[in-house]
Every structure is written in structure tokens, then in C-alpha cells.
Amino acid sequence: MWGELEAAKVYLALGPTDLRRSINGLSLLVSEVLEADPFSESWFVFCNRKRDKLKILHWQGAGFWLHYRRLERGRFGWPQASEQPASLEITHRELRWLLDGLALEQPRAHRPLRYRLAG
């Protein structure tokens, strides 16, 4: 399941989300607020107001997956909401940072270089 993440895009729904919503409510939020296709291979990540709970919604073949994480101590390093846009595309590495309790604004390792010719 997590191995398939490498093929998918990851979007954060900025601002707090009422996590009492389940699959139907979150997929409606994806289509109407985020203006995205909930049936795509993308992963949609939602966080509550206190930033201690998180849900990830994604479609796989014949049905939805809904992952839920609750922190017993601490908060997720969720970015601040702004007027526009309603979502933020992040990298797979940044999602792992969030799940590990780190903020997205981490100092990055050396950027990968893509050369065509050596010499």
C-alpha cells in the first residue's frame, strides 16, 4: 500500500477539516472544494483544527482507502491555510516528514542533479 505512494501525487487540504467526515464526505470535499478527482491515484491528506489527527483518502482499483492517524502527544507540522489555493501538492518525502512530526519547511538535502552528458 505505501509502496504505491511513489506513483501517486499527494495533496494537503489546507485549513482544518472536520474529521468526523468519512469516505463519502471527504471525497465530496475533494471534488467540490479541492476541485480534484477523488477517483484518481492521488492521495488527499486532511488534518483537524488541533493538528493532532490526520486522515488520508485515496482510491485503489475497486474502492477507497481511508487511513487515520492520531497523535497521543504533539502536533503535525501542518502548513497555515491561505485564501488560495485550497490545496498544496507536496512530495512523498514531505508526506513522510509530516507523518514523522516534522514541518514541511525542512532544510533539504542536496537537490538531485540530472545531467545528460558526462565530462
Regions found by a protein language model. Name each.
Residues 1-119:
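Polybasic/polar functional segments that serve as interface/processing modules
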